[in-house]
Amino acid sequence: MQPYNQSVNEVLEETKSQFEGLSPKEVKNRQAKDGFNELKEKKKTSTWELFIDTLKDPMVIILLLVAFVQLFLGEFVESLVIFIVLMINSVVAVVQTKRAESSLDALRQMSAPSAKVLRNGEKTSIPARELVVGDIVSLEAGDFIPADGRLIDVQNLRVEEGMLTGESEPVEKFSDVIEGEVALGDRKNMVFSSSLVVYGRADFLVTAIAEQTEIGKIAQMLETAEAKQTPLQQKLEKFGKQLGWVILALCALIFAVQILRLFTTNQTADMQKAVLDSFMFAVAVAVAAIPEALSSVVTIVLSVGTNKMAKQHAIMRNLPAVETLGSTSVICTDKTGTLTQNKMTVVDSFLPTQGSKELTDLTQADQKLLLNAMVLCNDSSFSQEGQLLGDPTEVALIAYSDKIGYPYQDLREKSPRLAEFPFDSERKLMSTINDFEGQKTIFVKGGPDVLFNRCNQVFLDGKVQEFTPELKEKFQAQNEAFSQKALRVLAYAYKPVSDNKTELTLTDENDLILIGLSAMIDPPREAVYDSIAEAKKAGIKTIMITGDHKTTAQAIAKDIGLMNEGDMALTGQELDALTEDELRENLEKISVYARVSPENKIRIVRAWQNEHQVTAMTGDGVNDAPALKQANIGIAMGSGTDVAKDASSMILTDDNFVSIVSAVSIGRVVYDNIKKSISYLFSGNLGAIIAIVFALVVGWVNPFTALQLLFINLVNDSVPAIALGMEKAEPDVMEKAPRQLNEGIFANGLMRVILIRGSLIGIAAIISQYVGQKTSPEMGVAMAFTTLILARTLQTFAARSNSQNILKLGFTTNKYVLMAVTFCLALYSLTTLPFLREIFSIPAAFGWSQWIVAAGLAVIAVICMEILKSIKGVFEKH
C-alpha cells in the first residue's frame, strides 16, 4: 500500500516515527543505514582513464614515437629520459585534475539547500541532505520541497509540480486518504522533491529520500552535462594538430636535406651513423617545436582560476565557464539578496494621527494595535539558536518588535492564535484570528492598495471612524512617499468577531478597520556601489531584473549607480508590448526590468545575444532554469533550487553581485595569464627552431640534442609557465572592453610578441654556438644549450606583463615566478655535474669563462625584450 492510501497514523507507524519527530540518535542510525538525501553523482573518470587521456595528446604521441625509434636504434638513455619525463608530466596533470575535482566537490556542499524539521519536538533548520525517512518537515510559501512525503497538516497549500507532472497550474493539496491507485499528479496528499510551494503552509512526513524520490527516479534528466573543453583548449588542440603536420613536414624536409648533403659532399663512409645523426637532427626540430607542457599548463591555470573564484564565493561548475566569464559584457542580475542584503529592516511606520514615525509608546491604542498586528499576523520566528525562520519580510517585523523593547514572544503569548488564512499571491493578504485582550479579533496584513479597498473604517484618535475618501487619499499619498524611497510597504487592519468564530473565509477579509502602515527596506550591499562602477569601467552593462515593483526597483537602481540619466525601466507587461525591433532599438537604454516572468528573462537574454553580447543571468527558482540555460553564463544562487543550479555554469555561495564582478575579473586574469604562458612557451620554442635551422643552413652541427630540448621543454619550461598562471591582475584588467568569444589565440599582438622574443632567444643561442665552436663543436653545443635554457628561464620575468617592464613590476611581486626561476637555475646546475655532463653533451672543458659568455648573452636577450616593450609603451601612449 502506498503512503497516499494510508492514514497519517498508519504512515507514522510504517516509518517508525511520531508527531514530535525523530530523536538525534534515530536520525544517525537511519543515515548510517539509508545514506544521505542526495542524488548519486555520475561515475567519475578513474585515475587510470585520466592518465591514458594525457597520452592521447598529438604532441605526446609524436614524442612517444621518437622515444620508440631511439630505443630501436639503441639510444637507451635518451629514450628512457623521454619516457620518464612524459610519465612525470602525465602524473602531474592527473594529480592536479584530481585535486581540482576534490576541491570542487567540497565547495559544492556549501551551496546545499536547507529544510525546517521537527526533531524531539523542537523545530530546527538543517541542510536538506541530512533528512531521513520519518522526519517531519515544515513548509511555507516559497520553499523548495527537499524530499517526497505524506502531508499531515495542511493550511491552504498549493504546490507547483510542473517539472514532474507537466501541469502548469499549482496543485491544491490536502491531508485526507486517497483510495486506489492514482497517477502522480493526482496524489494530492503527497509532496515531491524539487517542487515549489506557491503559497500556504504545511507539515509533511518524509517517506522517500535521494534515489527513492520521484525526481530521483528520473535523475538522468538532472545530470550535469559531460565535461567540455574550453574554447581556448579547442583552439589549441586544433592548432596543435596543424602544428604537428607542419613539424612532420619540416622534419622530413630537414632529414631529406641532410641526406642529400651527405651524398653531395661524399660523406658516406659511415652511412649508418650519418643517417642516424640526420634523423636525430630532424627529431631535435620536432622536439624543439612542440610545446609539450602546453596542454597541462592550460588545464592547471584554469583549475587555479576555479579555486580563486571559489574563495570569492563563486563555484564554477565546468572549466569552459571560467574562460567565458572573462568575456562577459552584460550581467542580468536579480535585485533581492544579490544587489541588496536580503535582510529586510523596518525603518518607518505611519498612523493617521501621528504621521510617519517610529513606534515608541504602546500605551497609545493605535501604536499598540499596529505593533500587535505586525507580530500576531505573522508566521516567522527565531530558533533557540537565534536562527531566522520564515519569510524575510515577516522576520523584519518581529525583529523590529524586539528592537523597540517588546519581545514578539510576549505579545504572542498574551494573544494566542486561534485560526489563520495564509498569504497567497492571488489575495495578497494574510489573516489570523487571535484572542486579543479578551476579544476574538481578526488581524489582516497585506499590500496597501489591496487592503485599502477592503476597509470601510479606520482607527483614528483612539476610536473607530469612517474611512473617508480624504483619509484614503492621505494613506495613498504616504504609501507613494514610502515607495519613492524604495521602501516596501505593508498595511494592517483588524476586525473584532464573535466568540463562536473558529475559522476564516474570504468574506472575513472585508469591512475591515484600517490601522496603519509599516515601511521597510532591503538595503543595498555596501560593496555593490563600487562593483557597479567597476563593471561599468570594464565595459560591462549591468541590468536589474526583478519581480519587485518598478518604482522600488528604479529607486534602488539609481541609488547604486546602475541607472543613469536617460536610462529606462520597463515592467514585464511593457516589455511584452514591445516588438522585436522596438526592443532592439531601446535595448541599450533599458537598465531595469520589473515584475518580469521567466519568459521575459529568456527574451531579454536572447535580445542581448542577438547583439553578439556575452550575457550572464542570475536565478534561483525552477522557473529560472530555461533563462540560465539560455545565457552564456547561468549564475545560480547558493540558496536556490537544485534545478536552477543544474542549469547554471556558476553558483554564488553568498548570492552577492560583488562576487559576480570579482569572478569576471578573475576570468579575465586567468585568460590573460594563459596567453602569457602560451607566449612564454612558444617564444622559447621558436628561439630553439631559429638556432637549429640557422645551423642547418650554414652547415654547423646541430646546436642541441633531442635530450637537451626535451629537458628544457618538459622539465624546465613547465614550471615557469605554471608560475605565470599565478600572476596577479594587470592594473588595467577591468578597464578594457570585454574580449570577443571568437577571438583568436594569437590576437592582440601576441604573435608579434612571440616572434620578437623568439628571435632574440634564437640570435643569442646562435652567437653563443658561434663563440663556443671556436674551441670545438661540442663546446658550441654546450654554450648554445646554456644560453637557450638561461634565456628561456629569464624570459619568465619579461613574460609577466606585455605592458609593464620588470623594474616597474618588481622581481619579488610574484613569489611563484621567483621560485620557478630559482628551481630552473638549480636544475640547469645539475646538468653540469660530472656524472650528468656526458648525458647532456657538456664537455669537461666547459668552465666559468664559457658560462659567463653564455649567461651574458641570455641576459642581453631579456634586456632587449624589456627595452622593446618600453619603446612600444611610449609609442602607444603618444
Curated annotation (Swiss-Prot):
Mark the transmembrane ranges: 50-72, 76-95, 243-263, 281-301, 681-701, 704-724, 753-773, 779-799, 816-836, 845-865
Per its record, the protein catalyses: Ca(2+)(in) + ATP + H2O = Ca(2+)(out) + ADP + phosphate + H(+)
Q: Please state how the activity of this protein is regulated.
A: Inhibited by very high concentrations of cyclopiazonic acid (CPA).
Sites binding Ca(2+) sit at: 287-288, 290, 292, 713, 717
Write down the superkingdom of origin. Answer: Bacteria
Q: What is its EC number?
A: 7.2.2.10
EC class of the enzyme, as a word = translocase
Q: Where is the active site?
A: 334
The alphabetical list of record keywords is: ATP-binding, Calcium, Calcium transport, Cell membrane, Ion transport, Membrane, Metal-binding, Nucleotide-binding, Phosphoprotein, Translocase, Transmembrane, Transmembrane helix, Transport
Q: What is the effect of changing residue 59 to L?
A: CPA-sensitive
GO CC annotation terms, alphabetical: plasma membrane
**Subcellular location per the Swiss-Prot or TrEMBL entry:** Cell membrane
| Location, primary (coarse class) | membrane
What membrane topology does the annotation report for this chain? Multi-pass membrane protein
Per its record, what are the GO molecular function terms? ATP binding; ATP hydrolysis activity; metal ion binding; P-type calcium transporter activity
Its function? Catalyzes the hydrolysis of ATP coupled with the transport of calcium.
Family label: Belongs to the cation transport ATPase (P-type) (TC 3.A.3) family. Type IIA subfamily.
Record's protein name: Calcium-transporting ATPase 1
